[in-house]
């Protein structure tokens, strides 16, 4: 766990410095009149990362963006869950690659790497270091003025780098539709294959309501979120939000370095967050550009599930802090 904490401490300043530099750079470009800010779709955040699988630049509502045409979107994330006995720290890096030669808007290939340091009692026989190597493709289609359809497909190797059997391979996918009743209300319905042992498939259902430019209510299962605008200087917006949801992952590993097994971690969480992002048009909550999020929250209903022994271990409640950025 000390290794994971050190990794988190080193990584968090990198995230913050990168974002600060990106904010300064973006503000300067906007003042010079060279940036075009598009509109996009951002799914609920958290370790149910499958909902984040559709990159913002894949949205057909997005206009051309000169800054995004010059570089590939990169995402960074660092999270630490503080518990005296079973804490964990994780860091994540992902890159999105648009397939420009296919069609407009292009499908997006997303490549990711996640490292998790997990602290558990020695009697569990769980390695401290767990890794997730992922690749996937996502696409968005506008059927008409009211309907958009999103599809995604991906594969992931989640392992301690010792067990690379079928226990470690996870396949993900999803299909859901969005119906915009008006500029301020949209409805979402579909399902996502998580690749997790405890949650193979979950529904995605709910609505997003924005009664005015300063308030946005995302009542979308499995991660609802209520947002309030704090400040808007014309180029960037600062939001505060309250969110809930589930998080977790499944890995293949070698128990006591000899027996192939499968481990699933899951939790529920309630978080308070701050978000800094480029300003968009009134009534359009999702935009492309450099973003930063800082979350602090309470994590409960934490469980470890072991496939071979068909047993579960309940973990103590914990506090969580999370830094993330996309630029």
What spans do the regions from the language model cover?
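Cleavable N-terminal export/targeting peptides
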Residues: 1-69
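Short loop/turn motifs that connect adjacent beta-strands in outer-membrane beta-barrel proteins
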Residues: 60-71, 99-108, 142-148, 183-184, ...
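Membrane-embedded beta-strand positions of outer-membrane beta-barrel proteins
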Residues: 74-78, 109-113, 151-153, 187-189, ...
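Transmembrane beta-strands of outer-membrane beta-barrel pores
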Residues: 78-84, 113-119, 155-161, 191-197, ...
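Residue-level signature of outer-membrane beta-barrel architecture
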Residues: 97-101, 139-141, 179, 193, ...
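Outer membrane beta-barrel transmembrane domains
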Residues: 125, 236-305, 311
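Outer-membrane beta-barrel "beta-signal"
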Residues: 204-208, 272-274, 313-327
């Amino acid at each position: 766990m000390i290794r994971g904490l050190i990794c988190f401490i080193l990584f968090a300043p990198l995230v913050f410095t990168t974002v600060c530099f990106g904010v300064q750079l973006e503000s300067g470009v906007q003042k010079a009149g060279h940036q075009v800010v598009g509109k996009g779709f951002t799914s609920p955040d958290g370790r149910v990362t499958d909902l984040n699988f559709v990159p913002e630049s894949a949205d057909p509502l997005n206009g051309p963006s000169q800054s995004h045409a010059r570089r590939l979107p990169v995402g960074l994330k660092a999270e630490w869950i503080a518990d005296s006995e079973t804490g964990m720290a994780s860091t994540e890096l992902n890159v999105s690659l648009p397939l420009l030669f296919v069609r407009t808007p292009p499908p997006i290939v997303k490549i990711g790497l996640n490292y998790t340091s997990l602290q558990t009692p020695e009697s569990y026989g769980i390695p401290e270091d767990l890794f997730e190597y992922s690749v996937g493709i996502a696409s968005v289609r506008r059927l008409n003025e009211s309907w958009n359809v999103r599809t995604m497909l991906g594969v992931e190797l989640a392992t301690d780098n010792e067990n690379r059997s079928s226990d470690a391979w996870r396949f993900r996918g999803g299909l859901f539709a969005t119906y915009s009743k008006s500029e301020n209300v949209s409805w979402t319905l579909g399902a996502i294959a998580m690749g997790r042992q405890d949650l193979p498939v979950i529904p995605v259902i709910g609505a997003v309501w924005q009664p005015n430019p300063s308030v946005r209510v995302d009542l979308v299962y499995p991660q609802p979120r209520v947002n309030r605008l704090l400040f808007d200087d014309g180029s960037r917006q600062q939001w505060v939000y309250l969110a809930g949801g589930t998080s977790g992952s499944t890995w293949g590993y070698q128990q006591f370095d000899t027996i192939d097994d499968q481990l699933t971690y899951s939790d529920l969480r309630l978080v308070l967050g701050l978000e800094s992002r480029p300003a968009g048009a009134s009534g359009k909550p999702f935009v492309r550009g450099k973003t930063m999020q800082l979350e602090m929250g309470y994590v409960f209903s934490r469980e470890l599930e072991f496939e071979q022994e068909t047993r579960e271990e309940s973990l103590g409640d914990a506090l969580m802090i999370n830094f993330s950025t996309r630029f």
